[in-house]
């Protein structure tokens, strides 16, 4: 195991894509009490790295048996714990309990931890959470409780919460009011749950002002129509979506990135993409599209389009670029069309007149 001081120093800013938890230290502390201000950084870019010198050391001798404690970080991962340990210092800000055998969160498990900023419970066996288990956590901003046995979203989440990762559980329903009062929530990762479209009650996301939402690897057959309209990123990859209809994207006009790869999409209704004027990146790879979706030339800010591994047989000269010069505000820097039955030698060079570099175009490698 790496020494805690070194792990702390390597804590880096997490990527918006793919938002996959690989370990306790693979998540952000941006805007947290330990984050170095941009003004303090000089030389190399360390704006997302935890600065150990900026952390006020704790002088408490409290540290649960078998755990590693340094500054205000308590690391109790991979210990075979059956319950949340006692003797946790009240000034703890990061608590790592991942990779244990915890099955229940009880009422007083986090009593006195009013300064806790991040709680990691990934890869346990949690199936039951007391309705007041999180009540003491008045400053909690990041809750990672993925890869457990939850069948419902925990009740009474702290109003301070900014990021919730609850993917890879057994959740089938998102009831109305479950996110009530979470005005600070910015990001929810809830993929890998057996969620169907009918599992989202009308108004389930009311009051949320999310920027990021991922519901990948679920059982969706269409794009949910009642998600927060504030979204900048929406990832619905690895579902069973078969078509995009005109009204599906109507309320998501603020999207920068839309992920719909690895679905069963055969049809995108004309005009559907016109509701996404700020879109920068579109993932439609590994679907069943027979042609390039219409409307791409009208997306003035679009820079990346993934269309590989579809059934596209033809690429028209105006499929990607507008007809007039100066219309597109941002040129493409990535278009993937490989693994499609397109005779790429027949595609006219002018087709990619609004691409920054021909190396950004990926063609060929079609396998029947």
Swiss-Prot record:
Keyword Glycoprotein: yes
InterPro entries: Leu-rich_rpt, Leu-rich_rpt_typical-subtyp, LRR_dom_sf, LRRNT, SLRP, SLRP_I_decor/aspor/byglycan
Signal peptide: 1-16
Disulfide partners: 63-69, 67-76, 321-354
SMART domains named in the record: LRR_TYP, LRRNT
Per-repeat ranges for LRR: 82-102, 103-126, 127-150, 151-171, 172-195, 196-220, 221-241, 242-265, 266-289, 290-312, 313-342, 343-368
Record Gene3D superfamilies: Ribonuclease Inhibitor
Keyword Cell membrane: no
Keywords from the named record: Aortic aneurysm, Disease variant, Disulfide bond, Dwarfism, Extracellular matrix, Glycoprotein, Leucine-rich repeat, Proteoglycan, Repeat, Secreted, Signal
Subcellular location: Secreted, Extracellular space, Extracellular matrix
Maturation propeptide residues: 17-37
GO (cellular component) term, any one: cell surface
GO molecular function: cytokine binding; extracellular matrix binding; extracellular matrix structural constituent; extracellular matrix structural constituent conferring compression resistance; glycosaminoglycan binding
Phenotype when changing residue 303 to P: In MRLS; uncertain significance
SUPFAM superfamilies membership: L domain-like (SSF52058)
Disease: Meester-Loeys syndrome: An X-linked, thoracic aortic aneurysm syndrome characterized by early-onset, severe aortic aneurysm and dissection. Other recurrent findings include hypertelorism, pectus deformity, joint hypermobility, contractures, and mild skeletal dysplasia.
Function text: May be involved in collagen fiber assembly.
Protein name as catalogued: Biglycan
